[in-house]
UniProtKB/Swiss-Prot annotation:
Belongs to the ferric reductase (FRE) family. Glycans are attached at N118, N133, N357, N627. One of its GO terms (cellular component) is plasma membrane. It comes from Aspergillus oryzae (strain ATCC 42149 / RIB 40) (Yellow koji mold). Residues 349-475 form the FAD-binding FR-type domain. It catalyses: 2 a Fe(II)-siderophore + NADP(+) + H(+) = 2 a Fe(III)-siderophore + NADPH. This is Probable cell surface ferric reductase kap2. The gene is kap2. It is an enzyme of class 1 (oxidoreductase). Keywords: Cell membrane, Electron transport, Glycoprotein, Ion transport, Iron, Membrane, Metal-binding, NADP, Oxidoreductase, Transmembrane, Transmembrane helix, Transport. It is a multi-pass membrane protein. PANTHER family: FERRIC-CHELATE REDUCTASE, FERRIC/CUPRIC REDUCTASE TRANSMEMBRANE COMPONENT.
Length: 752
């Protein structure tokens, strides 16, 4: 055997130092402290930590899923014994003399006993356990609250949600303690073995890599088990990468504290390795890509050079993984974690083939994509309509690539249309119109706007879709009350949920009895984006179930001279919307013909039922009403008085449905409807001219909440923060009121 062979072998292995005849008893005793063969347990420690978190999240997900399905099933069972013509989940108060064959509820029924006042619905036994519901409410009271933004001069630093931050903090504490608490941190000499601290940190870092990749992929097992979509897991992906860098630095530093070149075995190291390679070259080869990956994923840098980030992130990740293979040399079964990483990565890409619209050979879009039309909406918004055989659920999003706009760019957009047989595409019964609505800001969206402006709305484009991804992990139909908050283009994530919920309510498949929509936008033209969807909600929702509250925030006074003029404009615009909605309470004739499907007898019956509704007497002229609602603080001076104007001579049948917004700057006087009897409770549409006072709005709504309420918000960060704080505060109602079981919050990402 060559001289010094044992020393060279020990340096090659770097850490597994064999016991030979020359090893002293003191060195043997020191080597047994946190021995090298047992160091693999530190990688398993991180695996156990991650699996426990995954198991808890999965159990919570399936607990809620089970409870939601049981409540919906019990509701269907209750509805099976009632008349299919009763469509309103709330009472409709009518006078006894106004009864018709279409009436549903009376103060005094014509025959039989008085109706029972006991309307308690069946509930899932496990979902009504008060201590469990109170515990969940207490956890939400804590974790629904957002972390305040840190301001350092002009720099604003945002943090993840409190729940995500708690997981990140727990992981940081775990890996730090697991690295530094076991002893020893160093050996007396690196000739005995590599520093135990470095080995512990290195094994934990390697064990984290499969989880980092799993949290980054679009189709991953974490989303399948927990119901949390990949875009929400991305924050954990980034912070897990930062923790991996933190552990890699801990792994590196001890090798410089006890450097190999101070050992007597350094000369043998030089004999075994080429002299032109740095001693720790393989470690630096893996560390540098990791540093770059973490730095350019910082929010401030990623937003500044997003296109570059997308271009280099994947290649850098592949280089990093290859360098880790080279550096670790399969010590302590480290390659098991790395091969698991490769398997997760490849499996994700294989599964993604089922998410693209051009990979199915049974579809006409196979390898060529699908046609789409692009329309410019008011306020320069863009609507892309793709006729596709793809199926999706409300609130999901897709990645859109249009080679005619940009060959390789792919961007996520929320689907604003409903995938239902009630809304077939003109391409055929097997197709549905997938609608994407977004504002042009820069890059891809700006190019879409410019190309559409250049070629016009009649040009068709090729679209390649990937998805759908995301969506809610809870079923809205299992909640008694649903409240939607939307800010500006955030209505895109709300529209499909609203249509789907109304459809289920009409089909008697939803527990929901009340739906409230609060939409804040700057310009009246914004409502044109979803004019047809709102018309459907008003015409087809069960009576007295959908209430829409619009907040027009774009009317800001610019001086004292405009104060009175803006106030007058507000009052007139509000009144016109009221009158439009009141004057169109009947079912639209076009929908009657569509529902009759060409059968004259059914159409005749539907029109007769429509005429049975209580109608209003002619309109009267009164002074404009000044709104004094406490839902907002108006910046206008309410002391300004206006004089009545003559009524315009416009036929209601010739007036297009415009939700109260005039097509020009002409304003109209208030027209108040007088009725000859007590009407049904169908007035649920309202508009105000200020920013919504969200805490007060939710507080007022909470007085009529049922046992379970869902609050959905999609809007700018300020709106999400206000809604989160308000819902967190309302958890006290659940903990103190036995008639309330749950107030659930779902906050949608405004940028997707």
């Amino acid at each position: 055997m060559l001289p010094g062979w044992h020393s060279i072998a020990s340096l090659v292995k770097r850490i597994d130092i064999p016991i030979v005849a020359s090893t002293t008893p003191a060195e043997i005793a020191e080597m047994q402290q946190d021995a090298w063969p047992e160091a693999g347990k530190y990688g398993l420690g991180w695996v156990y930590f991650s699996v426990i978190l995954l198991a808890i999240s999965t159990i919570i997900r399936f607990y809620h899923l089970w409870g939601d399905q049981i409540r919906i099933a019990l509701h269907k069972e209750d509805m099976a014994g009632t008349s299919p013509y009763v469509t309103s989940p709330q009472e409709e108060y009518e006078l006894p003399s106004a009864a018709t064959d279409s009436s549903t509820t009376h103060f005094f029924p014509a025959r039989g006993p008085l109706p029972s006042t006991n309307t308690t619905k069946q509930q899932s036994s496990i979902s009504t356990i008060a201590p469990l519901n109170n515990t969940i409410a207490f956890v939400r009271w804590i974790f629904y609250r957002p972390i305040p933004v840190l301001r350092i001069g002009k720099l604003r630093i945002g943090f993840p949600s409190l729940g995500a931050s708690s997981i990140i903090l727990a992981a940081l504490i775990f890996v730090t303690l697991y690295s530094f608490v076991p002893q020893p941190l160093y050996y007396s000499s690196i000739s005995i073995g590599s520093p135990p601290l470095a080995i512990r940190a290195g094994m934990i870092a390697v064990a984290m890599i499969p989880w980092i990749i799993a949290l980054s992929t679009r189709a991953n097992f974490v989303s399948i088990l927990t119901g949390i979509s990949h875009e929400r897991l991305n924050v954990l992906h980034r912070w897990a990468g930062y923790l991996c860098l933190f552990l890699s630095l801990i792994h590196m530093v001890p090798f410089y504290v006890t450097p190999i070149w101070e050992s007597t075995n350094f000369m043998y190291y030089q004999q075994y390795f080429p002299r032109n390679i740095y001693i720790y070259g393989t470690g630096w080869a893996a560390l540098v890509p990791l540093i770059v990956l973490c730095l350019h994923s910082l929010p401030i840098l990623r937003a500044w050079m997003y296109e570059l980030f997308k271009l280099v992130h994947l290649p850098l990740s592949i280089i990093f993984l290859a360098m880790i293979f080279w550096h670790s040399k399969n010590f302590l079964a480290s390659w098991d974690y790395l091969w698991a990483t490769v398997a997760i990565w490849m499996l994700s890409y294989a599964v993604r083939l089922f998410y693209v619209n051009w990979s199915n050979p049974l579809r006409l879009s196979f390898l060529i994509g699908e046609e789409c039309a692009v329309t410019i909406l008011p306020q320069n918004a863009i609507k892309v309509t793709v006729a596709t055989q793809m199926k999706w659920k409300p609130g999901q999003f897709v990645y859109l690539r249009m080679p005619g706009i940009s060959l390789f760019e792919r961007h996520p957009f929320t689907i604003s249309s409903l995938c239902s047989g009630d809304f077939p595409s003109e391409y055929g019964e097997n197709y549905r119109d997938l609608a994407l609505v977004f504002r042009p800001f820069g890059g891809f969206t700006r190019n879409v706007f410019l190309k559409t402006f250049e070629y016009g709305p009649y040009k068709t484009w090729t679209a390649f879709l990937e998805g759908p991804y995301g969506g809610m992990k809870r079923d809205m139909a299992a909640f008694d009350d649903v409240v939607f908050f939307a800010g500006g283009s955030g209505i895109t994530a709300t529209a499909s949920h609203l249509l789907n919920l109304i459809k289920k309510m009409r089909d008697r498949k939803a527990v929901t009895r009340s739906v409230r929509v609060v939409w804040a936008f700057r310009s009246p033209e914004t409502i044109d984006w979803f004019r047809e969807e709102l018309r459907i909600c008003r015409d087809f929702a069960p009576p007295n179930t959908v209430h829409c509250h619009f907040f027009l925030t774009g009317l800001e006074p610019h001086g004292q001279d405009q104060l009175a003029q803006n106030q007058f404009y507000q009052e007139m615009l509000r009144d016109k919307m009221y009158n439009t909605l009141e004057g169109m309470d009947k079912r639209n004739s076009a929908y009657i013909r569509e529902e009759a499907a060409g059968d004259p007898e059914i159409e005749k019956e539907l029109r007769r039922e429509n005429e049975d509704a209580i109608t209003a007497l002619p309109l009267a002229h009164t002074l404009p009403h000044i709104n004094t609602s406490r839902h907002y603080t108006s910046p206008m001076d309410n002391n300004y008085q206006h004089a009545p104007y003559p009524a315009p001579h416009v036929s209601p049948a010739d007036t297009p449905f415009n939700f109260g917004f005039p097509p020009s700057s002409t304003v109209f006087p208030k027209l108040t409807t007088r009725v000859g009897t007590v009407p049904l409770q169908r007035n649920g549409w309202r508009i105000d001219y200020a920013r919504p006072n969200i805490p007060q709005v939710l507080k007022d709504y909470s007085r009529t909440f049922g046992r379970r309420t869902c609050v959905f918000v999609c809007g700018p960060p300020s709106m999400r923060v206000e809604v989160s704080k308000a819902v967190a505060q309302l958890q006290q109602v659940v903990m103190t009121d036995s008639s309330k079981d749950e107030i659930f919050l779902h906050a949608e990402n405004y940028n997707v």
